[in-house]
Amino acid sequence: MNATDTTVTELATTPAGTLAADRPPGTGVHAGPVTIRHRDFSPSIHPDAYVAPTAVLSGQVSVGAGSCIMHGAVLAAQGGPVQVGAGCVIMENAVLRGTVPHPLRIGDRVLAGPHTQLTGCTIADETFLAAGAMVGYGAHLGRAASAGLGAVVHIGAVVAPQGRIPAGWVAVGDPAHAYPPSQAEAIRTALAGTGWSFLPFILGIDDAGGRRDQLRTALARYTTAMASHHRQDQLLPPADAVDDDHVW
């Protein structure tokens, strides 16, 4: 390290904006994220939030004060809004989707780890979701709950405040009961007892038919709906270049 290098400690203790004048033109400056106008709705990002330039926000998406949306994250309002509260961290490659009739609502001070998938669910304040966790339609995690690495909170499951779903386990029911992955038969039985089934619930497909026919019907409906739903999407102009010293 030479005398002109800046250490991480110095960055962390330097008031925002004071380093920019010492940098070559263009250093530490980025364009805004990819934002898409969808069905007359455009994303809303609080001025104090940070959204990485490679993140994608589509439609009725709101990001609260002090929240950070990291690289590769996708926040898509596909008929229902996506709301991210204040002080949240949505990490790399997370996918957050709001649908009809299930919006996605995330409270304050929530951490969603890399590759998490959250669809049409409610995540209360101060919840922790480890990398690869999945939360399905209509599910609810109470305040200060947690889902471990690769855990699944199934469609319609309700996890109590401070409830913990261990890594790799599957939560089913209201109130939720967590099963280890080794109990596949118990998981299937529990799911059958909830009345929640993906194809009938999401796509209106009769569960009684053969699997092959079900998938053919499902994909025909899904591709048609998605194409129609997004045909009028409009890529918004990039935001003005912003200095990212504030991240430190």
For each predicted feature, which ranges?
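Glycine-rich hexapeptide-repeat left-handed beta-helix
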Residues: 3-40, 78, 92-93, 99-106, ...
